[in-house]
Amino acid sequence: MEEGNVVRDTNRIFGVDIDNITEKEAQDITKELIEKSNKSCTFIASPNVEFVMHAQKDKEFFDILKKAKLSTPDSIGIIWAGKKLKKPFKIRIPGQRYFRLVLEMAEKEGYTVYLLGGKGDTPRLAKENVEKIYPKVKIIGYHEGYFEQDSEEEVIEEINKLKPNILFVALGAPKQEKWIIQHQKELKVDVAAGQGGTYDYEAGNIKRAPIWIQKIGMEWFWRLLKQPSRIVRMMAIPKFMLKLFFTKDITKSKWEK
């Protein structure tokens, strides 16, 4: 897949392009996007199985994912799809891991960060906790995600006043991705990336699965045990696996002729 003069190494999974990159490459590409953006709000995504399956029934979301200039592989199901394509992904980069990688890079480069999303004190607690890990990172603002439509302009105005290099948006998918694209021309940020439930983990609201569970790709099951309300969303995983197993050409989407 070619973006301008840059050829991206991607795997196409049911029409969704996902970058085949290492963690270091994810940092380097993000840095390059920031440097070239000039406050044009370059969109970054972290597609997982739920994203891919939702995109099969939501054309707007499918088209939005096509706009991402970087898409990190964020679930074990995506990794398995790469193996079926006989082009294995180099590594799985979950959303929270990408969040940490970017903060690490931002601390080193002096980039500024804004956290949008989460409930109540969650973004503040997430900010305080990650600042203990990255003491020199410049998180210059935050705002919880349960704002009313009439206060949305105030939120955007605050972000634009600060002009952060990096905007993380944690409103849940597909809302966060749609929100970024809806306001892409208004937002004076260099890059914007959806972050789902990352703030909850960073704030300590939800405990991450033990490392051994993460390594075997069963973190989704751990999350289901901790959050039974996610069961409807989690049904996307077995549906994806069946689709993966029974579909001969897994690169195509029903939206593409």
Predicted regions and their residues:
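A short, gly/pro- and small-residue-rich
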Residues: 59, 63-67, 177-195
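Conserved acidic residues
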Residues: 69, 113, 140, 165, ...
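Short, flexible loop segments at boundaries between secondary-structure elements
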Residues: 144-150, 190-226
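A transmembrane-helix-recognition feature enriched in membrane-embedded lipid enzymes
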Residues: 77-82, 209-257
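Short glycine-rich anion-binding loops that position phosphate/pyrophosphate groups of nucleotides
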Residues: 48-52, 171-176, 198
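Conserved beta-alpha
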Residues: 79-158, 162
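Proline-aspartate-enriched helix->loop->beta-strand connector
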Residues: 159-169, 173, 189
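N-terminal nucleotide/polyanion-binding subdomain common to many enzyme families
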Residues: 2-91
